[in-house]
Amino acid sequence: MKVEYITDPFPYTLIDDFYDQKELDGIWQELDFYCYPEKLSPSDKTMPAMDQHGNIMKKNHGLSLDAVYRDQRILSNILSINRKILRSDTIKSHPSWFYQNLFIDLDYTLLSYYENGDYYKPHQDAGTLTILTWLYKGEEKKFSGGDFHFTDYNIDIEVKNNRMVIFPSMIWHAVDKIKMKEEDLDQGLGRWCLTQFLSSNLTR
């Protein structure tokens, strides 16, 4: 695992290879179950950000895992394995006061999947802290695009397998449009993202 704490122009954390192979196997066991169109919901059903006119800012498919499993989170490999970041000291080890003084007692996990033509326009998240983990099948991507951007700061982050980025939810961010070949569609070969939205009862 490689952790990089960035402080300028705002504090965020970039982590490569956060999950070990056993954890990845468990995550993929669940993702393989979801990689059928009928199991994922369209953009308007997955807590989308909207512009001032009420237009949805993204095109992708996804699933709110907390809504599915509710009080049975232990039945989800993903919801069990992604506790790892919350149990570790990784978040609060960032030197910024923002991370060292966080109080978090709520978290929600959204599973998102991007295929050909999918994107997420610049937006902010509700909550205090956002954690993104990107995943795709195989050693090489079967898609182009899908990179991540902090749009107000012209910061571009390449999407890599098992890469995590942690940042304040109010920071504007976006995802490039995905491009895929026809023969690679509908097989779960696109861009997967596990998003953890962290906040507290005091901010909701």
Which residues are covered by each model-predicted region?
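Short, conserved beta-strand element in jelly-roll/cupin
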Residues: 113-115, 124-141, 196-198
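Short hydrophobic/aromatic beta-strand or adjacent loop that forms the aromatic wall/cage
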Residues: 10-12, 128, 191-193
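Catalytic core of Fe(II)/2-oxoglutarate
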Residues: 137-204
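A short glycine-rich, His/Asp/Glu-containing loop-to-beta-strand
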Residues: 100-113
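Non-heme Fe(II)/2-oxoglutarate
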Residues: 1-96
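Short histidine-centered beta-strand/loop micro-motifs
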Residues: 120-125, 157-158
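Tight coil/turn sites that cap or link beta-strands
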Residues: 107, 117-118, 162
